[in-house]
Amino acid sequence: MSENGNKNIAIVEAFSETDKKTGEVVTLVPNTNNTVQPVALMRLGLFVPTLKSTARGRKGQMVSMDASAELKQLSLAKAEGYEDIRISGVRLDMDNDFKTWVGIIHAFAKHKVVGDTVTLPFVEFVRLCGIPTARSSAKLRKRLDSSLTRIATNTISFRSKGSDEYYVTHLVQTAKYSTKNDTVSLQADPKIFELYQFDKKVLLQLRAINELSRKESAQALYTFIESLPPDPAPISLARLRARLNLTSRTITQNATVRKAMEQLREIGYLDYTEVKRGSSVYFIIHYRRPKLRPALPPTKAAPEEPEDILPGDDQEDIIDVVPEEKEGEMVMLSKEELAILEELRKAKARK
């Protein structure tokens, strides 16, 4: 079989996995409502909240993370004896870069791959990123160009301990935008297609991401929590802080995590109880609903605040333990009942 044929097979296999109960090979196909994401990337914190209003956020902070434990099962690492695996590059955000990455995953899954490259119209790539095509303006083209550049600068390096041998590749090998043809061409490294083949893949619902527009901390925690197995063990506050990879004071980071978890509860994605065991705080996840629940009547919107810079640092009185509440029965209200409920809320707010 030709080299191109082998590469195409690798790409098809990247979006397939075997049902452990039936043995049937199931192909995971991304669409506008969901995307296939390798769990390793979701748990590592590759895409994190980025406060762009600060000088450091605008400049583009460089980060490096140890991915040895998550990526050591790659056949490349096993065959060559690579033990030290790192991902390095510009800090990638949730608001732009994650959407662009979603578009990249969609492109390789839904369009013909020639060798290791896929080419598609720019407007189609915008649609695969989950962005309305009506917004495909010059400003959007510049934004996506910057995002593709940031993703392409992120490298995955494989090194052997006690040896000078190493291999360096990119999350996206090359990304090219042709103004003449108005197309986007993406090239990936076939040696790391196996990254998508991990038995720990997850089909992320994008509905929650869209509901959490501009709430990057909540978006990042959603991608992490959704990648966990059924009935996950309690998640420590420290682990969620690490997933967000923020740089503010610990007490401010704790407040950011709590705010993000509450936002996930507000959109109907999950319910949880916060408990304290010794000196550590944990979140017990009761359920997860990627498709969310019916929207509740809107309440008076509070002004938005930056995710990882909160007013005041003297927040020592943050509650560490949230008492468990009994989950009430959910009912659908008629338009008349919703109108009455809204009037009652407005009256209460005026008091």
From Swiss-Prot:
Signal peptide start and end residues: none
Biased composition (Acidic residues): 304-315
Coiled coil spans: none
Swiss-Prot/TrEMBL GO biological process terms: DNA replication initiation; plasmid maintenance
Gene3D superfamilies: Winged helix-like DNA-binding domain superfamily/Winged helix DNA-binding domain
A Pfam short name: Rep3_N
Keywords in alphabetical order: DNA replication, DNA-binding, Plasmid, Plasmid copy control
A GO molecular function held by the record: DNA-directed DNA polymerase activity
Region (Disordered): 295-315
Keyword field contains Glycoprotein: no
Family named by the database record: Belongs to the initiator RepB protein family.
Protein name according to UniProt: Replication protein RepA
Lineage, opening ranks: Bacteria, Pseudomonadati, Pseudomonadota, Gammaproteobacteria, Enterobacterales
